[in-house]
From Swiss-Prot:
Keywords: Cell membrane, Ion transport, Membrane, Transmembrane, Transmembrane helix, Transport. Belongs to the anion channel-forming bestrophin (TC 1.A.46) family. The gene is yneE. The chain crosses the membrane at residues 28-48, 50-70, 194-214, 220-240. It comes from the Bacteria. This is Voltage-dependent anion channel-forming protein YneE. GO terms for molecular function: chloride channel activity. It is a multi-pass membrane protein.
Length: 304
């Protein structure tokens, strides 16, 4: 996620970091060079009686813009839902530890439970990003729990099971009444719902055929556009073609980023920062001495 301070409108025009321009610049350069080639080809295909007009490109451009808008809205809806789910995880984690800490007198046992919660957040983050988990989870889980988690097809769900087992032990030991156990178990169910929601987004992409047809149409439009522009614009064709192509290609590229909000690209969710905030909150609630530093944006204003 790009987290920038408010900028002057003129300065924002020239922003590079965080823009999709860095990803599509090579494609725009090819469009520029192809437009120059079309200028030299103009006498040849005019001599053959081939004539392109702007009318069909105007109609096609409007249609592409509408469908790009639909796709971007679908991608942004996934992004917003993903952010809401991680917000719910933060709320449920704080509430669960608060209820446990104010109920159970054993601080060492509560500390173990807090570390399970932190491990769950990091495990979910790394699962969604397909990152290795052993080194990070080893800081929070006991050896036997770590082995159980790593052996599972759903590590985050296994941690939830361990948390449920921990609550069951407290209930059997008489530390929790039936009513409190049900209340705390409901919190675990809330966290489980977050896990299922994130998995739904991560493993259900926007239909490939829809993405493919829009992607093809955008690039065919950008390839054919110089032939229609060159008749009237001549040597200005490369500049206008690149400007129009930038609009369509950048929207197509942005939609690809928003489709998977859990990645590490510029416009994805800052899961590292969210997990860091959860960890800091839970450790401070448990009066821990060692608190990690807050994750801040880098020099390019990117928060991962």
């Amino acid at each position: 996620m790009i987290v920038r301070p408010q900028q002057h409108w003129l300065r924002r025009i020239f922003v590079w970091h965080g823009s999709v321009l860095s990803k599509i610049s090579s494609r725009l350069l090819l469009n520029f060079l192809f437009s120059i080639a079309v200028i030299f080809m103009l006498p040849w295909y005019t001599h053959l009686g081939i004539k392109f007009t702007l009318a069909p490109f105007s109609i096609l451009g409007v249609a592409i813009a509408i469908f790009l808008g639909f796709r971007n809205n679908a991608g942004y809806a996934r992004y917003v839902e993903a952010r809401k789910l991680w917000g719910q995880l933060m709320i449920a984690s704080r509430s669960l530890l608060r209820e446990v800490k104010t109920t159970l007198p054993d601080s060492a046992s509560v500390r173990e439970f807090a570390r399970l919660q932190i491990a769950f957040a990091h495990c979910l983050r790394m699962t969604l990003r397909k990152q290795p988990q052993v080194e990070v989870l080893a800081h929070y889980l006991k050896t036997e729990d770590l082995q159980r988690v790593l052996a599972s097809n759903s590590p985050a769900n296994r941690i939830l099971l361990i948390m449920g087992e921990w609550l069951a032990v407290q209930r059997r030991n008489g530390q929790l009444s039936d009513i409190l156990f049900i209340s705390l178990n409901d919190r675990l169910n809330d966290i489980s719902a977050v896990l299922a929601g994130c998995e739904r987004i991560a493993y259900t992409p926007i239909p490939f055929a829809y993405t493919l047809i829009l992607h093809r149409t955008v690039y065919l439009f950008c390839i054919m556009l110089p032939f229609a522009l060159v008749v009237d614009l001549h040597y200005m064709t490369p500049f206008i073609s690149v400007l129009i192509s930038y609009t369509f290609i950048s929207l197509d590229c942005l939609a690809e980023e928003l489709e998977d909000p859990f990645g590490t690209e510029n416009n994805d969710l800052p899961l590292d920062a969210i997990c860091n905030a959860i960890e800091i909150d839970l450790l401070q609630m448990n009066d821990e001495a060692e608190i990690p530093a807050k994750v801040l944006p880098d020099r390019h204003y990117q928060l991962t």
